[in-house]
Structures are given as structure tokens and as C-alpha cells.
């Protein structure tokens, strides 16, 4: 089971430098904001100023045995995430997404999320903005799951053949008490888009399913399967295929 909920609403914002006295939650008049948000743009005459922004939000939690993870698509620049006054994680780069596992920090009922964003200049050759400039999501998942960005694909064409060997590596996370958390991994290959071929005026569709049993518990699972004569991408038809991996236990998607 996995649920992904957008948390772009319900935030409050305050721009204020921090010190040892107000390291986590400074006093001040917070203003309501909706993400994505750039606070540097408020002062167009001073777009490269050193500054610190604070974002806070309430989050309700009902214990159900699932992990809770905050997924940030982008914060500029250096950030730290607090849950109920405790630091849950930091991220020191403004141009990539990241996640923070807050499972051990949340409590039943109402919780407070606080994100501190530190912007220091000079840092770019262009206007970067500052703040939580992309969406934020709450992910609810089982303790056993495919890790974020944990699916790696390497297609290798056989010499003098139209057959391709698709090498897949899956990185899985397991709960501490899971001896054999799932029975198999199901791989599903489908055509994602680019169905119309300008040269032949034909539609193409593909759905291939592979089921691979697993042996001993591991963090990395590797499988290889073959595909014959896939339609390749070219300038006339942007063929694109999608591979989805699912963890299967007792015939059901985990």
C-alpha cells in the first residue's frame, strides 16, 4: 500500500534571520502562503539578499502502521525539516528533490511541521529565488517497499539481432521483522506515449508482464528478461516505453 498526498496548502511563512535563541521556531507574524513559493521576489530591488525563510504547517496523524515520508520536489537553498521541534533531516542542495522520513517524529493527533530555508549569496549566475519552490507530498507506505529512485534499467542489444536484454535492478527497503516480505517482483512494460507513427499512420501498443520469484531476503534484486523487436525512438515517432515494478505477496500487490 502506498498513498501520495499533495501538501501545497495550509502553509504559513515568515522571513527572519535565526540565532541560537530562535534556532527552530522564531516568533513573528507568519503570513499564509500556498506552495510553490518564492519569497525573494517580494523585494524586486534586492533579489540577491542573504535571508532565512520559515515555513510551518499542521499535520494530523492517525497511527496505522504505515511509514510517513515528506517528499520535497525542490527547496532553494539549504534546508532543515523539523517535526514537533525536533530536527528530522537536512538538505544542502537547491536543485534536486529529496525525502525526509518523519515516522519516528510524529505523534497521534496534531503535529507541527517546520522548514527552515537559508539563502546566501552569491550562489548562482542567475536569479535562483528562495523558498519551497516546488510541490511537497506526504507519502504513506509499508515498511517494505521499493526505495525512492530504486529502479534501475539497462537495455542491451544483442549483436546482429533485434532482441534486447533488459537488465533490471530493484532496490528494496524492508521492515526489521520481515523475514520474507514478498514472494515475487512483477515487471510490467507498457508503451507510455508516442503511439502514432507518422510514416505508417499506425498505432502501436505493447504490454509485457514478467513475474520473477525471489529467493533469500536482500536489499538488491537483479533480473534480466528479453524483448524482441521493440519500436525504437526516432524523429518521426517518439516511441517511449515504461517499466513498472510491483512487489507481490500472496498474489496481491504489496
Give residue spans per PLM region.
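Short, solvent-exposed loop/turn motifs
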Residues: 87, 145, 152, 195-196, ...
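Structural beta-strand segments of beta-rich domains
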Residues: 68, 162-168
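Short beta-strand segments of immunoglobulin-like
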Residues: 150-159
Amino acid at each position: 500500500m502506498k498513498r501520495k498526498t499533495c501538501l501545497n496548502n495550509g502553509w504559513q511563512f515568515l522571513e527572519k534571520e535565526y540565532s541560537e535563541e530562535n534556532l527552530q521556531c522564531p516568533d513573528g507574524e507568519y503570513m499564509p502562503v500556498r506552495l510553490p513559493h518564492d519569497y525573494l521576489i517580494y523585494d524586486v530591488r534586492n533579489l540577491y539578499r542573504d535571508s532565512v525563510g520559515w515555513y510551518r504547517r499542521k499535520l494530523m496523524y492517525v497511527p496505522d502502521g504505515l511509514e510517513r515520508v515528506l517528499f520535497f520536489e525542490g527547496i532553494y537553498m539549504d534546508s532543515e525539516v523539523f517535526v514537533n521541534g525536533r530536527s528530522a533531516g537536512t538538505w544542502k542542495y537547491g536543485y534536486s528533490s529529496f525525502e525526509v522520513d518523519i515516522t519516528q517524529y510524529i505523534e497521534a493527533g496534531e503535529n507541527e511541521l517546520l522548514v527552515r530555508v537559508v539563502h546566501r549569496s552569491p550562489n548562482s549566475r542567475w536569479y535562483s529565488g528562495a523558498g519551497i519552490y516546488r510541490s511537497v507530498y506526504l507519502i504513506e507506505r509499508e515498511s517494505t517497499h521499493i526505495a525512492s529512485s530504486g529502479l534501475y534499467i539497462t537495455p542491451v542489444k544483442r549483436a546482429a539481432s533485434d532482441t534486447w536484454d533488459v537488465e533490471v535492478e530493484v532496490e528494496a527497503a524492508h521492515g526489521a521483522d520481515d523475514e520474507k516480505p514478498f514472494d515475487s517482483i512483477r515487471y510490467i512494460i507498457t508503451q507510455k506515449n508516442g503511439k502514432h507513427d507518422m510514416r505508417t499512420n499506425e498505432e502501436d501498443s505493447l504490454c509485457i508482464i514478467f513475474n520473477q520469484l525471489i529467493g533469500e531476503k536482500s536489499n538488491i534484486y537483479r533480473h534480466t528478461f528479453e524483448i524482441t523487436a521493440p519500436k525504437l525512438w526516432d524523429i518521426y515517432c517518439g516511441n517511449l516505453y515504461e517499466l513498472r515494478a510491483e512487489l507481490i505477496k500472496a498474489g496481491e500487490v504489496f
